[in-house]
Amino acid sequence: MRFPKKYEHFDNREERAAFIAETFEKEISQSSSVLDVGCDYNTLKKIVGSKVTGIDLYGDPDYKVDFEKEKLLRFKDGEFDFVVCTEVLEHLENFHEIIDELIRVSNRYILISLPNCMDIFTRLNILFRGKAGKFYGLPFEKPADRHRWFFSHTDIERFFQHYASRHELSIARRFLHCNFSHTWRGNLVRACVKFFNLDSAAQSYWILIEKN
């Protein structure tokens, strides 16, 4: 099975928020309320506007929320038309509980992205350097942040196919994101990935779930 792919490059949260606003413009424009889970400095709100409510433990959110302790209990069932949670769940021990909460507070759409922790570049790094990246391993001091989960894009796909079926949800869109820089090296890798259609080269998996 080959996944559709997107190749837009972003270096930071601001560029990722712009990618979200552009890629999901139709769904966001149809929504009167948006919840950004893990908003950091509310960058999506700065782009989309006041209909976005940002929550996070750090940064400059509208509400400070510790997802490990409070979950999303301050919000009502179906309170938001569009719920965004990108590059957050892999940091949480209560992964499954938070997904249930994302579904609960959404009235229609839920956008989730997760890293493809087993992309080909990580595998090569482990093979030749013995390192899996900054969010893994055994640092000398207790880290402020780390990934609690290690999964591939196929693991994520199987999980959401099962989850959607069990909860009578629809998968509206999903794609793999290949985030390569615009340097000559990045352009070369991008060209090779496109030519060979390599799913394993993607750095993240994105899925838009719709409630029936």
Cite the ranges covered by each PLM segment.
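Intrinsic structural disorder
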Residues: M1, S31, V37, S181-H182, ...
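S-adenosyl-L-methionine-dependent methyltransferase catalytic module, highlighting the catalytic core
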Residues: K6-D11, E15, E93-N212
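Conserved SAM-binding loop
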Residues: A21-T122, W206-K211
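A broad, low-specificity signal for short, low-complexity segments enriched in glycine/proline
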Residues: D11-A17, L35, T43-K46, K71, ...
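A near-ubiquitous, low-amplitude feature marking generic local secondary-structure context
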Residues: F3-Y7, S31, L35, D81-C85, ...
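Conserved class I S-adenosyl-L-methionine
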Residues: M1-E27
